[in-house]
């Protein structure tokens, strides 16, 4: 039986066979629950960490209307306050979870594709995201308050998320993948220390 590929090896393979600009490499804080990784952070911890980072590079509100979402793929229409929007299709390729410390880290990478198009007539869930972004070198640090509104008669839910994403994808050509993955993990963990 073949040994499964490591997170790093999966990423290296995808970078060889796909346009690097379609790859999203991210690190999210959270905790491991039975069967799933929860990315909701304590509101006080989230607010305190956000205040430590100083002046943000960007603040924005966007609405995601999901028409399809499975554990491995999602399609959503993203709308900005000016009414402009686009379709985003995301295919999750690999993930790994590191526990220990105050919070665990979910490292993941996906293939993303964006396209113009009309908004959906119906959707299964809507998420309004209030995002504050900080930039640190090639990394983007997002603090996002998310209001999830299911299309069914369930309650609205607010969550507080912290994500570090490799923003400057050319960084992949400057350092070895192991170092980049380590850097992303360390950066996201340092935010709440």
Curated annotation (Swiss-Prot):
Changing residue 26 to A: Complete loss of 5'RNA triphosphatase activity. Keywords: Hydrolase, mRNA capping, mRNA processing. The keyword S-adenosyl-L-methionine does not apply. It is an enzyme of class 3 (hydrolase). Gene3D superfamilies: mRNA triphosphatase Cet1-like. It catalyses: a 5'-end triphospho-ribonucleoside in mRNA + H2O = a 5'-end diphospho-ribonucleoside in mRNA + phosphate + H(+). Its cofactor is Mn(2+). It comes from the Viruses. Signal peptide: none annotated. Its EC number is 3.6.1.74. One of its GO terms (molecular function) is polynucleotide 5'-phosphatase activity. Catalyzes the first stes of cap formation: by removing the gamma-phosphate from the 5'-triphosphate end of nascent mRNA to yield a diphosphate end. This is 5'RNA triphosphatase A449R. The lineage of its organism: Viruses, Varidnaviria, Bamfordvirae, Nucleocytoviricota, Megaviricetes.
């Amino acid at each position: 039986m073949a040994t499964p590929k490591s997170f790093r090896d999966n990423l290296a393979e995808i970078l060889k066979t796909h346009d690097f600009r379609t790859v999203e490499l991210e690190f999210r804080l959270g905790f491991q629950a039975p069967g799933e990784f929860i990315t909701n952070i304590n509101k006080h911890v989230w607010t305190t960490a956000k205040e430590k980072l100083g002046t943000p590079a960007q603040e924005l509100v966007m609405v995601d209307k999901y028409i399809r979402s499975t554990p491995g793929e999602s399609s959503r229409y993203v709308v900005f306050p000016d009414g402009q929007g686009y379709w985003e299709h995301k295919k999750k390729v690999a993930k790994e979870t590191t526990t220990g410390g105050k919070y665990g880290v979910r490292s993941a990478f996906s293939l993303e594709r964006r396209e113009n198009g009309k908004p959906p007539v119906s959707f299964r869930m809507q998420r309004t995201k209030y995002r504050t972004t900080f930039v640190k070198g090639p990394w983007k640090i997002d603090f996002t308050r998310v209001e999830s509104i299911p299309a069914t008669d369930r309650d609205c839910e607010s969550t507080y998320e912290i994500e570090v994403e490799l923003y400057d994808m050319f960084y992949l050509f400057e350092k070895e993948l192991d170092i980049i993955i380590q850097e992303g993990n360390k950066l996201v963990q340092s935010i709440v220390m």
